Amino acid sequence: MNNTVLILKKISKHYKQGNTIVKVLDDLNLTANEGELIAIIGSSGSGKSTLLHIAGLLDKPTNGQVIIPNSKYKKYHLIRLYYLGFIYQQHHLLKDFTALENVIIPRLIRGLDQKEAIRDATKILDDLGLEKKLYNMPGELSGGEQQRVAIARSLINKPRIILADEPTGNLDPKSTNEVFNLFLKVAQKQNTTVIMVTHNHELAHKMDKLYNLKNGLLNIA
């Protein structure tokens, strides 16, 4: 039986708009297990990114609990650092750092050994097909290659959970499938849980579970 790595319990997120209360998320529940691949689809403005921000402890719900079972850390910034990885549509690579340097930054922030970080980053970049691009600057890489570097960066700390918000949204169809398949391969190799928000239904159907976010609730799609 898989270990549970994330529980969203009765999550609500409400905003005040004039005299009206807008319910973006409304008593929502989600359980994610170790190694699971979960996709969340929904129309624009349905609250997908809000849900991901709450799951990633980047935003607080109006009501409800975000539970990381068996976490030895209580402070949110430590949970994010040690247990969570993030991938966004915009990769936010540092332009004056090589691909390899961009990937090892999260490991160095934790004060871990640089040689070990370089070794692990090199292996992940190799798994993502970038073994010949380690010392290239981001400006020398294609859009797909830049996104693979961002994916490698999210994986370097071997997070329990990766939260991906439209991770291939800026790529052409060929690059999208190539990057996404490599991403899933490496995530599964590390037994990392992936929760991905996407508008791409083809990618969504490659995941273990598919949910549709509508009217503030998650429904099995």
Curated annotation (Swiss-Prot):
UniProt KW keywords: ATP-binding, Cell inner membrane, Cell membrane, Membrane, Nucleotide-binding, Translocase, Transport
EC number: 7.6.2.-
PROSITE patterns: ABC_TRANSPORTER_1, ABC_TRANSPORTER_2, LOLD
Topological type in the membrane: Peripheral membrane protein
Listed Pfam families: ABC_tran
Major enzyme class: translocase
CC annotations in GO: plasma membrane
Protein localization: Cell inner membrane
InterPro entries associated with the record: AAA+_ATPase, ABC_transporter-like_ATP-bd, ABC_transporter-like_CS, MacB-like_ATP-bd, P-loop_NTPase
Example GO molecular function: ATP binding
Quaternary context: The complex is composed of two ATP-binding proteins (LolD) and two transmembrane proteins (LolC and LolE).
Family per similarity comment: Belongs to the ABC transporter superfamily. Lipoprotein translocase (TC 3.A.1.125) family.
Function description: Part of the ABC transporter complex LolCDE involved in the translocation of mature outer membrane-directed lipoproteins, from the inner membrane to the periplasmic chaperone, LolA. Responsible for the formation of the LolA-lipoprotein complex in an ATP-dependent manner.
Protein name in UniProt: Lipoprotein-releasing system ATP-binding protein LolD
Species assigned in the record: Rickettsia typhi (strain ATCC VR-144 / Wilmington)
This protein's encoding gene: lolD
